[in-house]
Amino acid sequence: MSATGYGEQEIEQDIQAKGLTGPRITPRDLDTLITAELYHVFPGTTLTVCCLILMNGYAVTGQSAAVSPENFDEEIGRKIARAGAREKIWPREGYLLRESLHLQGD
């Protein structure tokens, strides 16, 4: 869920409920682009980095760091870092779709 409290699932449901059918990128589209996930926790820190490799070989990264070492949990750090990396795919794919539509005369 985003900082606005309006997450992908809610957005998808609203789009479908309103019958909006224009070209768009869906959460499923993003997920199909991801071919590999790499994680690294820097020793002695709470910093977790996720690198998502996309079908075309492009890599996007996200990170997470607990302020307090007592609150560090690697599984949670991985989830937050992955979400941050995945979030970076949206604008890139949106740009590619808009460019494709533009070239088609839309």
Language-model-detected regions and their locations in the chain:
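Domain-level marker for long, solvent-exposed, non-transmembrane regions
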Residues: 1-106
